[in-house]
Each structure stands twice: as structure tokens, then as C-alpha cells.
Amino acid sequence: MSTSTTIRVSTQTRDRLAAQARERGISMSALLTELAAQAERQAIFRAEREASHAETTTQAVRDEDREWEGTVGDGLG
């Protein structure tokens, strides 16, 4: 069994978390685990989107994309 700890949240937050856990039929601990994993996934996707956006704004990448687009019509393949 894993160790546990206590966290302090407002009564309102506790009640909201308890209601969400109850609706899903899981414990508050399981709900918090799911929410933490979801936040981590969202952060990863956000970082990937930001990196992709930054990459597409550089002139070198736009130039390379233009070169690749030119090869589509060269009849070689």
C-alpha cells in the first residue's frame, strides 16, 4: 500500500472534489490522481503545440517547407 498525506483545501474545494468523485464512483484520492495525470498530459500537449508554433515561425523552416513543396511537382516520384 502506498503512503498518503493530508492536503489542505478550502471546504468549498473539498465539497466540489467530493461531488465529482461521487459522480464518477471513485474516491477523492483516485480523482486527484486522475486530475494530476490530466494536468500533466495537458502540459505536454501545450509544450508540443508551442514548440511546433515556434518552429513554423522561423524563416529557415519556412524556406525548407517551400523547397519540399517544390519537389512535389518535379516528376521524380
Swiss-Prot record:
Question: Keyword annotations for this protein?
Answer: DNA-binding, Toxin-antitoxin system
Tell me, what is one Gene Ontology molecular-function annotation carried by this entry? DNA binding
Keyword flag Cytoplasm = no
A GO BP entry is: detoxification
Which residue intervals make up region (Disordered)?
49-77
Keyword NAD applies: no
Subunit organization = Forms a complex with cognate toxin MazF7.
Task: Tell me the function of this protein.
Answer: Antitoxin component of a type II toxin-antitoxin (TA) system. Upon expression in E.coli but not in M.smegmatis neutralizes the effect of cognate toxin MazF7.
**Any idea what this protein is called?**
Antitoxin MazE7
